[in-house]
C-alpha cells in the first residue's frame, strides 16, 4: 500500500497507492507536472501554499485547473507521506479518505 517515491536531501517522500493511482489517472499532463513540481519542492523543504486540516493532516493547494489538492502528513522533518489527491469539487470526500489512509499508516507504523 505504501510506495517509496524518493529521498531528496534529508526528506523521504512516501506515496500511498491511492495517491499514485490518482496521479496516474489525471488526464491533464500539465496538472501532473505541476503537482510533481510541488512535491519536489516539498522534498526540498519548500511547502508553499499549505493548509492544516486537522488530526495532523495538511493539504497542498495547487492553483491550477479545478484547484488540485494533495493531502499529506509529516512525521518529523525527514518523512512526508502523500495520502491522496483530488480537487476543490471532491474536497470533503478526499479529506475523509485521507484521514482513513492516515489512520491505516499510523496503525501499521506505531
Can you describe what each PLM-predicted range is?
Residues 69-73:
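Short, surface-exposed beta-strand/loop micro-motifs that present aromatic residues
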Residues 1-66, 76-80, 87-110:
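Basic, Lys/Arg-enriched alpha-helical interface segments
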